[in-house]
A protein has these predicted regions:
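Acidic beta-strand-loop-alpha-helix segment within the catalytic core
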Residues: 1-83, 132-163
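Small-residue (primarily alanine) positions within well-ordered alpha-helices
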Residues: 4, 23, 108, 115-117
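Hydrophobic residues within well-ordered alpha-helices
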Residues: 85-89, 107-114
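Paired acidic/hydrophobic, glycine-rich loop segments that form the ligand-binding mouth/hinge
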Residues: 92-96, 119-121
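Acidic donor-binding loop at a coil-to-helix junction in glycosyltransferase catalytic cores
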Residues: 103
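Acidic, metal-binding active-site segment of PIN/NYN-like and related structure-specific nucleases
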Residues: 116-132
Length: 163
């Protein structure tokens, strides 16, 4: 992806980015936070819609691991808006496994990268826009964030890690 646009009509926030051109919120340049330690990071996630016991166990295992290894965890509803939250420093990191599809993450991926962040698969592998799995973070905590999540296996109702 080379262009990203995310608009929140309730707050009138327009996030935009073009590859190589920086990231913006309502025409003001934005950048990711500079938090350097996972233990000080504010993390966003979403719980998803699968309710089989094994998938719920995997989800709650990841949430527990994040609660134990970050400052705090938030669930606020939108993959794209959470990614923009990372891009502007409202969040230090975000991950979601099992969102709807590329429309939920492609624009956010461009915006986060142009704001100085990283976008990966939660396993640490390369981000796949069709994989329905995303992790984004400021440039300092990405690998520590992956380390926390990678210890918890995926649930059977979730898109699986790349091979």
């Amino acid at each position: 992806p080379v262009v990203g646009v995310v608009y929140n009509p309730i707050t009138e926030e327009m996030f935009t980015a073009t590859r190589g051109g920086g990231a913006y919120l309502n025409d003001e340049r934005i950048s990711c936070s500079q938090v350097e330690e996972m233990g000080r990071a504010l993390i966003g996630t979403e719980i998803g819609v699968h309710r089989d016991a094994a998938t719920v166990d995997a989800i709650m295992g990841r949430v527990r691991a994040l609660v134990e290894n970050s400052r705090s965890v938030r669930c606020s509803g939108s993959c794209a808006m959470n990614m923009c939250g990372v891009a502007m420093g409202r969040l230090d990191g975000f991950f979601e496994i099992g969102f709807g599809g590329p429309w939920d993450c492609v624009a956010g991926a461009v915006i986060v990268r142009e704001a100085g962040g990283v976008v990966l698969d939660p396993s640490g592998d390369k981000f796949d826009i069709y994989g329905r799995r995303v992790l984004c973070a400021n440039g300092n905590i990405g690998s520590a964030f992956v380390d926390v999540l990678s210890k918890i296996p995926d649930g059977p109702g979730e898109p699986q890690r790349p091979n």
